[in-house]
Regions:
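Short, hinge-like loop/turn segments at secondary-structure boundaries
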Residues: 113-115, 135-141, 197-199, 222-224
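General small-molecule cofactor/ligand-binding pocket signal
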Residues: 119-121, 233
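Short, well-ordered alpha-helical microsegments
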Residues: 82, 105, 128, 187-190
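Glycine-rich adenosyl-binding loop in Rossmann-like folds that engage adenosine-containing cofactors
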Residues: 29-58, 121-174
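Short, conserved active-site loop motifs that form the nucleotide-linked donor/cofactor pocket
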Residues: 93, 118-119, 177
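S-adenosyl-L-methionine
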Residues: 1-111, 172, 210, 215-224, ...
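Active-site segment flanking the S-adenosylmethionine/decSAM binding pocket
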Residues: 70, 74-78, 151-215
């Protein structure tokens, strides 16, 4: 029942807002983002049209991004930020973008042309070095295929079904210098497993979700990152930039 109202709202918006209302493309940080005709919900198209889609992450990434860097994104959604980062790091850089939703991976594949330095991966992923026992048994959506989060648990002595920094390094030969995280509350894993970030990681941009674990919970999770040798240097909305000291 709780998902019924959003579904009805989306049907009404689609009926009363014609597709021609949306621009064919919008320019975000030099990247042409297709909008009209794309299988995106009203809210996503609205924020794209206003130029404010993922603006907090886009603002913070400009402070640390340079050509040639290796960037790991956890929670790629429709791939806008990954595409922007791929353009900025250039052919000598590398971007690995993980997304848990199969539908979102399909949409991002449809929206974007191939880019040699950018690889998109479907899978559950957590921002810890060793999360081999993290198991996600359910992917919960919030009434829209464009929103959702994995419900995780620890299974001691049993292998999980998720990616972590260590398995990514091993499987993809990828040791990122920048980590960007927006996994809808999955950052609360820090309460169970310390991040233990590898030395090569220099910057972390994380979107927090205090509506899930509270303001005090966010402060506690931020401290877990600081304890790994990082300083909190900037905030934008619910996104926080940490840089290694």
């Amino acid at each position: 029942m709780q998902n019924l109202f959003p579904k009805i709202r989306r049907i009404l918006l689609k009926a009363f807002v014609p597709e021609i209302y949306w621009p064919i493309k919008v320019d975000l940080d030099g990247v042409q983002v297709p909008v009209r005709g794309m299988p995106l919900n009203f809210g996503t198209k609205y924020w794209l049209k206003k130029g404010e889609y993922e603006q907090d992450e886009r603002h913070l990434i400009t402070k640390v991004l340079r050509p040639g860097l290796k960037v790991l994104e956890m929670g790629g959604s429709i791939g806008v930020l990954a595409q922007i980062i791929g353009e900025k790091v250039g052919p000598k850089g590398r971007v690995l973008s993980f997304e848990a939703s199969e539908r979102l991976v399909e949409i991002s594949t449809e929206m974007w042309p191939l880019m040699p330095q950018l690889q998109r991966v479907k899978g559950f992923v957590f921002p810890v070095n060793n999360g081999e026992n993290i198991f996600v048994g359910e992917f919960q959506t919030e009434g829209s295929e464009l929103d959702g989060r994995g419900i995780w648990e620890l299974r001691d002595g049993m292998p999980g079904n998720t990616w972590d920094l260590r398995s990514i390094r091993k499987e993809f030969n990828f040791d990122p210098e920048i980590l960007i995280v927006d996994i809808e509350g999955g950052e609360s894993i820090f309460d169970a497993i310390p991040p233990d970030f590898p030395d090569n990681l220099q910057s972390v941009i994380m979107e927090f979700h205090p509506h899930i674990y509270g303001i005090d919970g966010q402060a506690r999770l931020e401290e877990k990152i600081i304890e790994c040798g990082f300083s909190l240097v900037d905030r934008s909305g619910q996104c926080v930039l940490f840089v290694r000291t």
